[in-house]
A protein has these predicted regions:
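Aromatic-lined substrate-binding rim segments of carbohydrate-active enzymes
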Residues: 83-152, 167-170, 226, 231-240, ...
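Bacterial N-terminal signal peptides that target proteins for export
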Residues: 1-12
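N-terminal carbohydrate-binding accessory modules
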Residues: 28-101, 117, 290, 360, ...
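Extracellular glycoside hydrolase catalytic/binding regions
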Residues: 49, 74, 81, 161, ...
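Aromatic- and acidic-residue-enriched carbohydrate-binding clefts of CAZyme catalytic domains
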Residues: 113-123, 154-164, 208-215
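Boundary at the C-terminal end of the N-terminal hydrophobic targeting segment
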Residues: 24-25
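Bacterial N-terminal signal peptides
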Residues: 11-21
Length: 372
């Protein structure tokens, strides 16, 4: 056996070799996960392509687009979804939306759940069907990364849920999803649902965060992981050649956008900032309606008590505020249990809040028209 000769440089060389092998292995694992080819779309959809100019969202012809609709949840917690196809159909044809916000889970996208054996193919195909249904109705769809895993896939012991920040696996998710739907005119990319409990520096640039797992079991430790910032996710989308409109929710569960005015904005174009002003949130001007604001703002979630009129005053005030500031919106949620629900049952009978939202949608469609 040949004798190994070590020098002072040997530890450094070995360290570099091991590091490079580790990086190569990580890159190979990511590459093996990427499953999507860019989908083709009907050229007749081209006029729907969105871009921003100042505070406005415009279509390909430079006409201002007014966006209003609903969230349709369940694909974050269910691989097969719960009535999602029928809900999309009802939202488009009965509720007259021109925008649907669709929450997703990165682990389900890649088939990382224990009940998935196809690498996520069926899940991705279902999302394709929903995107196509929206396209056929000339309706926009906001693909929202709602649930993440703190950087560890579920089938490797991770914790899937609504965490404080995205993680390294979120980069892989956006590489694949943005490749699949890049430049499809009716698709919007929503980077991460509701960041919270971090600084605006971490929100934009990433950093180490401590996160208590959802559904925490007795004695279960907190999770410490490296969060990925919104700038990295935005850059990931653009790196695959996607020019689609990108939405970025602020802090305090996507409510607070004030840090953008303090120098923590995302560098990029075709960007819309997102806020979730639920009934318990106050001081709208400070958090997302500052007169000096230079970017489009989107109310991605809002809602009030489904079965009483207790929140009706709040809802009326918010819709007046949205009209005054010309803010697009999607109400939460067209599901019977994802609160506050807009429907009582799967016959799509509206709740009190659902009836209010349905009336607001009808008024918006009458004022601005649908995209049909």
């Amino acid at each position: 056996m040949q004798k190994l000769v070590f020098s002072r440089a040997t530890p450094v060389v070995l360290f570099l070799a091991i590091s490079l092998c580790s990086v190569a292995a990580d890159e190979m694992a990511t590459t093996n996960l990427l499953a999507s080819q860019t989908r083709t779309f009907d050229p007749q959809l081209a006029p729907m392509s969105l871009h921003t100019r100042g505070k406005k969202v415009l279509d390909a012809g430079g006409k201002r687009v007014w966006l209003y609709g609903v969230n349709i949840a369940s694909l974050e917690w269910s691989t097969d979804g719960e009535h999602v196809e029928e809900s999309v159909n009802r939202a488009i044809n009965d509720w007259k939306v021109n925008l649907i916000r669709l929450p997703l889970a990165q682990d389900r996208w890649f088939g990382k759940m224990t009940n998935q054996t196809d690498g996520g193919a069926a899940y991705r195909a279902l999302v394709d069907k929903l995107v196509d249904a929206c396209a056929a109705g000339r309706v926009y769809i906001d693909l929202d990364l709602h649930w993440s895993d703190c950087g560890q896939w579920m089938n490797e012991g991770g914790t899937l849920g609504q965490h404080s920040m995205p993680d390294k696996n979120s980069i892989t998710f956006w590489q694949d999803l943005a490749t699949r739907y890049k430049n499809q005119p009716n698709v919007i990319f929503d980077l991460y649902n509701e960041p919270h409990d971090v600084s605006f520096a971490v929100w934009r640039d990433g950093g180490t965060v401590t996160n208590t797992p959802e559904h925490k079991k007795p004695g279960q430790a907190k999770i410490i992981y490296e969060a990925v910032g919104m700038q990295t996710l935005y850059d990931t989308v653009r790196a695959v050649g996607a020019t689609n409109l990108v939405a970025a929710g602020g802090l305090n569960w996507a409510y607070d956008l004030s840090g953008v005015l303090r120098g923590y904005g995302i560098k990029g174009t075709n960007l819309i900032y997102e806020t979730h002003p639920y009934q318990n949130k106050t001081n709208w001007d400070k958090n997302f309606g500052d007169p000096s604001w230079k970017y489009p703002v989107y109310i991605g979630e809002w809602g009030f008590s489904a079965h009483t009129t207790n929140g009706l005053g709040y809802a009326q005030s918010l819709m007046q505020y949205a009209r005054k500031h010309k803010l697009p919106w999607t109400a939460w949620d067209m599901h019977v249990t994802a609160g506050p629900p807009l429907i009582k049952n799967w016959d799509y009978e509206p709740t009190v809040s659902g009836q209010f939202v349905k009336e607001q949608l009808a008024a918006a469609a009458a004022a601005h028209g649908t995209n049909k």
